[in-house]
Regions:
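Class I SAM-dependent methyltransferase SAM/SAH-binding core
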Residues: 76-123
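A short acidic, Gly/Pro-enriched loop at the edge of an enzyme's catalytic core
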Residues: 126-134
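C-terminal lobe and adjacent flexible extensions of AdoMet/dcAdoMet transferase-like proteins
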Residues: 242-285
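A short glycine-rich, Lys/Arg-flanked "PGG" loop and its adjoining helix->strand segment in the class I
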Residues: 150-162
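Conserved class I S-adenosyl-L-methionine
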Residues: 59-68
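Class I SAM-dependent methyltransferase Rossmann-like catalytic core
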Residues: 11-53
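SAM-dependent methyltransferase
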Residues: 168-238
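Glycine-rich SAM-binding Motif I of class I
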Residues: 70-74
Length: 285
């Protein structure tokens, strides 16, 4: 598949990741450790009965959304290939640099071409393909408020096969941030010899439920990125998945974190039903 640019990417997200708060180079020690952990996790996940039927297929098509450099997608493909399954992997994200890195690295690891498409994850239905698995790996849900998440789920469910599976790698941020730790108005994000990155509370959007955070590098204070995040709990995420999938399960990895599984898309609410913005969002917050 050719590399395609589909409009709708969030420029702020690209600017946020450009601050290098979270390492994305798949060759880095951090990413390699994540990759090994993902391979181990997906290896155990194959014991789930929903994947037993999948393992009997001759070919499995995987779509990774919010893929970055494709750590999760490549790990899942590797696990399936080691079990004798022929795999096609497509990475999607709005960050083209990371996709290019991930495509090259993933092709080396798997010994076959890994394709990518630069696009907004809420529009993956426009790919016009059907996949067996849709994967969202790496705690990406805070980039989507509830209004966006509804569209994301609708779009993903339309590009999955009738027996398709959604895998979301998630944690309960309401529990971990607001109960265990406490919401921080000022939070050191990454401090090392090259940068001193802080995030600061910058507001709250009541209509979307999002917290505004300003990200600032004290060593380069001329550029500040202000973005909005939604701190999801697991319960509401799983309930939303249930609206779009016939069954939902949770594969717990540790307390308050694990893999949300959606099985067999319902396709009762179509992405076309959600194209018009509701009136409540048309006015200023």
């Amino acid at each position: 598949m050719a590399v395609v640019l589909i409009l709708g990417g969030n420029k702020l997200i690209e600017e946020l990741y450009a601050l290098n708060i979270w390492p994305t180079d798949p060759h880095s020690e951090f990413s390699q450790r994540r990759f090994r952990e993902a391979v181990e996790v997906f290896g155990r996940l194959m014991e789930h009965d929903w994947f037993q039927e999948l393992l009997r297929k001759e070919k499995v098509r995987i779509l990774e959304i919010c893929a970055g450099a494709g750590i999760g997608g490549v790990a899942l493909a590797k696990v399936l290939m080691e079990r004798g399954v022929d795999v096609e992997l497509l990475l999607t994200d709005i960050r083209e640099n990371d996709l290019e890195l991930g495509s090259r690295w993933g092709s080396e690891v798997l010994g076959r071409k890994v394709d990518y498409v630069r696009m907004d994850s809420r529009r993956v239905h426009e790919l016009g393909c059907r996949f067996d698995i849709a994967l969202m790996y790496g705690f990406s849900s805070p980039h989507f408020d509830p209004w966006d998440m509804v569209r994301l789920q609708a779009s993903v469910s339309e590009c999955l096969a009738d027996d398709g599976i959604l895998i979301m790698d998630e944690g309960d941020r309401r529990y971990s941030i607001f109960y265990q730790t406490g919401y921080a108005r000022i939070l050191p994000e990454r401090i090392d010899n090259e940068r001193a990155l802080l995030s600061l509370h910058a507001g709250y959007n009541f209509k979307r439920g999002t917290f505004k955070r300003a990200y600032l590098d004290l060593k380069n204070p001329s550029k500040t990125v202000i973005t909005e995040v939604y701190f999801w709990g697991l319960a509401e995420l799983m309930a939303m998945v249930w609206i779009f999938f016939q069954d939902v399960d949770f594969y717990e990895l540790r307390r308050g974190a694990g893999l949300i599984l959606g099985y067999k898309p319902r396709r009762k609410i179509r992405i076309g039903d959600l194209q018009t913005q509701p009136r409540v969002l048309l006015s200023q917050p």
